[in-house]
UniProtKB/Swiss-Prot annotation:
Family, as annotated: Belongs to the staphylococcal tandem lipoprotein family.
Record-given protein name: Uncharacterized lipoprotein SAR0438
Subcellular location: Cell membrane
One GO cellular component term noted in the UniProt record for this chain: plasma membrane
Biological source species: Staphylococcus aureus (strain MRSA252)
Length: 260
């Protein structure tokens, strides 16, 4: 009788161990799936890269939800900016924003030049230069006397026009941060300088540090899709004070502005 009780106790303990181990494995799987969810969420837009002709976006539709009014075909918003600290206590930030309205098939936006100071009282000096997209070329609408700046604007290329994320699924062991209350999700990957996108960025921008960047995939909003939230890519080459160097890219689809 005693042997039967001992055997029953042994079986109970064994079952408990199996259940606990299973729960732990389930949690691990759930955590792993969060990384996959982030990559799959980004893949919906990154699979389109490189978008060599931005006007192709007029024929592409993104995620739609109840925020869209009836008949609204939606608007694509693009942003690419490069920020770098060239002097102590300040960061130079330049880039372009473009709105491609699928209803009107017009694309307008602006190129911006900004200095960000540690002394926030100085942070009111952003300059904007209006642009439009015609035949896949940036057309400057404002008069710019600085010939170097004028050429930079007219020859500007968005990151989405030359980046390629065909290997996104192979990025592994990312550092995952989530906040379900906002909600927001972020995956960080340590890259190396042999990465094709990194090499392209080094060819285009004055990146002086030899350190390989960290790639951040950031989502604000429903990870499955939302026209209210946004997705942002960051290549952070340096976050050392007075050496900050970052490339930001943003491609999102949302309801059209009635005035656009």
């Amino acid at each position: 009788m005693g042997n039967i009780k001992s055997f029953a106790l042994y079986i109970s303990i064994l079952l408990l161990i199996v259940v606990v181990a299973g729960c732990g494995k389930s949690d691990k799987t759930k955590e792993d799936s969060k990384e996959e969810q982030i990559k799959k969420s980004f893949a919906k837009t990154l699979d389109m890269y490189p978008i060599k002709n931005l006007e192709d976006l007029y024929d592409k539709e993104g995620y739609r939800d109840g925020e869209f009014k009836k008949g609204d075909k939606g608007t694509w918003t693009l942003l690419t900016s490069f920020s770098k600290s060239n002097k102590p206590d300040e960061i130079d930030d330049e880039g372009m924003v473009l709105y491609l309205n699928r209803n009107t098939k017009k694309a307008t936006g602006y190129y911006f030049v900004n200095k960000i100071y540690d002394d926030i009282s100085k942070n009111q000096n952003e300059k904007k230069y209006r642009v439009e997209l015609k035949n896949n070329k940036i057309v400057l609408l404002d008069n710019v006397e600085d010939e170097k700046l004028k050429q930079k604007i007219e020859n500007f290329k968005f990151f989405s026009q030359y980046a390629d994320f065909k290997d996104l699924k192979n990025y592994q062991d990312g550092s995952i941060t989530t906040n379900e209350n906002i909600p927001s999700y972020e995956a960080e990957y340590k890259l190396n300088n042999s990465d094709e996108n990194v090499k392209k960025l080094r060819d285009i921008y004055p990146i002086t540090t030899k350190k390989a960047p960290i790639l951040k995939l950031h989502i604000d909003g429903d990870i499955k899709g939302s026209s209210v939230g946004y997705k942002k890519i960051e290549y952070k080459f340096s976050k050392v004070k007075d050496q900050e160097t970052t490339l930001r890219d943003y491609l999102n689809f949302g309801p059209s502005d009635e005035d656009s």
